[in-house]
């Protein structure tokens, strides 16, 4: 998430269920050195022909196009027109590279306006929508179990920005973090659902509208039988594409937090 919170995702970027990679699976100390740029730099030898930044960018582009199943050190080397062994001068292996990729794509926006008008509710809503957009841009993120994230600059910067805006809620520190995790989990579920729909269309060749239209004749007979009176009474737009299910659910979560915030303020009032 662009706020930098931890998360666990369990679907593939190509619609395949189950995480295929785990963050923090490489050398943790070395990964942190690379993320925070604190490692020793060689003072002798030929000047490197690549940069770590180029290696990470190439890896992200491959994952965006092919999913994590298409990512390997050899594949990245081929993309950069170099030998596989030359990459190990910049990054120890695929595990560390993955954590660098996560930090790269989850870099928070530097524009303060992107987190709303400065209020906690607007900040959490903006965070949720930005995170959903992030999964759409980089669906391979849903292939990574991020329950134990490596805390690089992007994670820390993002969390700092969001916590700064939501601290006035008056909740305890664990509750503030829990609110972020709760919203992040909601976003992951929504992103997963959208990816499954895209994968179903790709595999069947039927659009969502075509799929449901094929069921209409039988459903009309079933609903006319009187067996399902409540479902038969539903309006025609009940299952239509125009209703913003994501926005509706997000607002209800924020409404619940609003109640808690008001309750805490009432408890602290003289």
Curated annotation (Swiss-Prot):
Compartments reported by the entry: Cytoplasm
Ranges where the HTH tetR-type domain occurs: 49-109
Keywords, in A-Z order: Cytoplasm, DNA-binding, Repressor, Transcription, Transcription regulation
Activity-regulation annotation: Daunorubicin and doxorubicin can induce dissociation of DrrR1 from its DNA complex. Ampicillin cannot release DrrR1 from the DNA complex at the same concentrations.
Low complexity composition bias: residue spans: 1-11
Residue ranges for the DNA-binding region feature of this UniProt entry: 72-91
GO cellular component, as recorded: cytoplasm
Residues spanning the signal sequence: none
Superkingdom of the organism of origin: Bacteria
Coiled coil: none
InterPro entries: Homeodomain-like_sf, HTH-type_TetR-like_transc_reg, HTH_TetR, Repressor_TetR_C, Tet_transcr_reg_TetR-rel_C_sf
UniProt-annotated stretches for the region Disordered: 1-28
Record GO biological process: negative regulation of DNA-templated transcription
A family per Pfam: TetR_C_1
Free-text disruption phenotype from the record: The transcriptional level of drrA2-drrB2 is significantly up-regulated in the drrR1 deletion mutant compared with that in the wild-type strain.
Molecular function GO terms recorded: DNA-binding transcription factor activity; transcription cis-regulatory region binding
Described purpose of this protein according to its UniProt entry: Transcriptional regulator that modulates the expression of the drrA2-drrB2 genes, which encode an ABC transporter involved in daunorubicin efflux, in response to intracellular daunorubicin/doxorubicin accumulation. In the absence of daunorubicin or doxorubicin, binds directly to the drrA2-drrB2 promoter region and negatively regulates expression of the genes. In the presence of daunorubicin or doxorubicin, DrrR1 dissociates from DNA, leading to the transcription of the genes.
Name of protein: HTH-type transcriptional repressor DrrR1
Species, as recorded: Streptomyces coeruleorubidus
């Amino acid at each position: 998430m662009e706020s930098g919170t931890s998360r666990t995702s369990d679907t593939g970027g190509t619609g395949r269920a189950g995480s295929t990679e785990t963050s923090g699976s490489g050398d943790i100390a070395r990964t942190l050195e690379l993320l925070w740029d604190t490692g020793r730099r060689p003072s002798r030898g030929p000047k490197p022909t690549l940069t770590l930044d180029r290696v990470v960018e190439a890896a992200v582009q491959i994952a965006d196009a092919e999913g994590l199943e298409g990512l390997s050190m050899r594949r990245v080397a081929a993309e950069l027109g170099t030998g596989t062994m030359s990459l190990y001068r910049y990054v120890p292996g695929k595990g560390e590279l993955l954590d660098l990729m996560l930090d790269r794509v989850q870099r928070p926006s530097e524009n303060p306006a992107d987190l709303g008008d400065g209020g906690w509710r607007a900040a959490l809503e903006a965070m949720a929508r930005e995170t959903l957009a992030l999964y759409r841009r980089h669906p391979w993120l849903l292939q990574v179990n991020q329950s134990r994230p490596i805390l690089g600059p992007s994670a820390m910067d993002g969390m700092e920005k969001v916590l700064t805006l939501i601290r006035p809620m008056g909740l305890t520190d664990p509750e503030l973090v829990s609110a972020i995790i709760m919203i992040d989990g909601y976003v992951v579920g929504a992103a997963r659902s959208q990816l499954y729909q895209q994968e179903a269309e790709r595999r069947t060749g039927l659009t969502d509208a075509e799929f449901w239209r094929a069921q209409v004749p039988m459903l009309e007979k079933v609903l006319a039988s009187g067996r399902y009176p409540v479902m038969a009474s539903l309006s025609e737009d009940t299952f239509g594409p125009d209703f913003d299910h994501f926005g509706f659910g997000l607002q209800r979560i924020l409404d619940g937090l609003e109640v808690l915030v008001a309750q805490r303020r009432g408890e602290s009032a003289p």
